[in-house]
Regions:
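Conserved N-terminal entry element of GNAT/NAT acetyltransferase domains
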Residues: 1-11, 144-149
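Acetyl-CoA-dependent GNAT
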Residues: 10-13, 18-78, 94, 98, ...
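Active-site acidic-Proline motif in GNAT/NAT acetyltransferases
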Residues: 75-77, 81, 110-111
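Conserved acetyl-CoA pyrophosphate-binding loop and the N-cap/start of the following alpha-helix
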Residues: 78, 82-90
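Conserved active-site alpha-helix within GNAT-family acetyltransferase domains
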Residues: 85, 110-128
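Conserved GNAT acetyl-CoA-binding A-motif
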Residues: 97-107
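Conserved beta-strand-loop-alpha-helix junction that forms the acyl-donor binding cleft
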Residues: 106-116, 132-137
Length: 149
């Protein structure tokens, strides 16, 4: 069960609205797209059997030595099947040559145990815990990557 990543562009971005109507994403995901004020390093659809099942991106601010990873699998029937792990490994392989960063960071809700386990299996480790102003408890994780020089 292999996934592929397809770069999101102006030509295929309209399909993204399908994810925005998924009602349960807000239960475990704070954002479903890169931040507008960030430099997007890579933004992709996660494709399985020729169908977009989610999205993954790396974003950073100019001058930062790290990028932030965002990912979601939109349809619950595709969660827990290893697609997220494949997508994370694939985006790091694809974008590593373009990244001038030392690490990748992410934030996951403490209640999202499945995602936290996925990130750990991809080599991320916890470096902080905090509670957001809306009361949601969050784990911050990071992974050191090899710099391309």
């Amino acid at each position: 069960m292999e996934i592929t990543l397809e770069k999101i562009s102006e030509d295929n971005r309209a399909e993204y609205s399908n994810f925005e109507v998924k009602t349960d994403l807000g239960n475990y995901q704070s954002r479903i797209r890169p931040k507008e004020d960030m430099d997007i390093v890579g933004w992709y659809y996660i494709i399985f059997e020729n169908k977009p099942i989610g999205s993954i991106w790396l974003e950073k601010k100019t001058g930062d030595s790290f990028a932030v990873l965002g990912i979601f699998i939109a349809d619950e029937s595709y969660r827990g099947r290893g697609f997220g792990k494949q997508a994370i490994k694939r985006i790091l392989e694809l974008e590593q040559q373009h990244m001038d960063i030392a690490e990748v960071r992410l934030h996951v809700r403490m209640s999202n145990l499945r995602a936290a386990a996925c990130y750990k299996s991809c080599g991320f480790y916890e470096f902080d815990r905090y509670e957001r102003s809306d009361g949601i408890s969050v784990i911050s994780m990071k992974k050191t990557i090899r710099r391309h020089i």
